[in-house]
């Protein structure tokens, strides 16, 4: 495998990229939400379509949302991520899962 790093000016810790149906999807740690970026080109997320697909609201798992991963499993979209309860710190970290009810992972109503 040859390696040619792609440099980005965008701050995106814990990046996760998935290629599905001819499209690239990017997720990364934002801290307070789950956001997906969509691009036709893995080298250009600067001009990506962006969608916040989930906010913790009253679920009690904010602000420590990090390391999200988007997966398409058996025809359904899932996001696995870590979360922590406010005020409890790293000891409260848990793996959480949200599932889209739609075929489009970018749909915030999913």
Give names to the regions the model predicted:
Residues 1-110:
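Carbohydrate-active catalytic/glycan-binding domains of CAZyme proteins
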């Amino acid at each position: 495998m040859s390696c040619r790093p792609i440099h980005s000016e965008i701050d995106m810790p814990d990046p996760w990229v998935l290629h599905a149906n001819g499209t690239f999807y990017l997720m990364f740690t934002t801290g307070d939400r789950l956001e997906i970026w969509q691009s036709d080109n893995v080298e250009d997320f600067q001009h990506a379509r962006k969608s916040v697909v989930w906010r913790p609201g009253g679920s009690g798992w904010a602000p420590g949302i990090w390391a999200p991963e988007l997966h398409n499993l058996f025809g359904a979209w899932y996001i696995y991520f870590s979360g922590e309860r406010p005020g409890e710190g790293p000891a409260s970290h848990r793996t959480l899962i949200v599932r889209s009810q739609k075929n489009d992972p970018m749909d915030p109503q999913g």
